[in-house]
Amino acid sequence: MGCWVENLWGFAPNALAWVDPLGLYGYYELYKNGKLVYRGITERKVIERIMEHAGDCKDFDDARYIEGLKNYRAARDMEGSGLWHDWDTDKNKDMLNKKRKIVKGYYHSYHKDKFTNNKDKDGRTFLTKKQISDRMKNATPLTQSEKKQG
């Protein structure tokens, strides 16, 4: 996907096109040559967020996404758990997500001792690699025309 920026700001002629009025969230994964390079969530239409990444010069050539997740936590569980698995191995040094310091605002999402399925902890639900992979089996891939737009 190329990088062409004509306008660094924008006006939303239809605000509902940028934000889901039902409050649903989406989760997406970006790929380069078949390798996962980015995980993200959004409360807007996922395809528009993916196109923003293309405009921001993120280096990817494919994407898969799930829309209509019931809330922020459901989307964040997938993103946070996935990133924890990614960053726990040296083979994923090329991930485009920013690694974050262990600070209060993010600690509960990435540290295995703070997940809700860890007895007596209050935090997010930690998903296994298999659980994430199983959910992504039904994810929507980018169409050829969407790939050309980016």
Language-model regions, residue ranges each:
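Short turn/helix-capping motifs enriched in Asx and small/polar residues
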Residues: M1-Y25
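Boundary/linker segments flanking structured domains
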Residues: G26-K32, L36, R44-G150
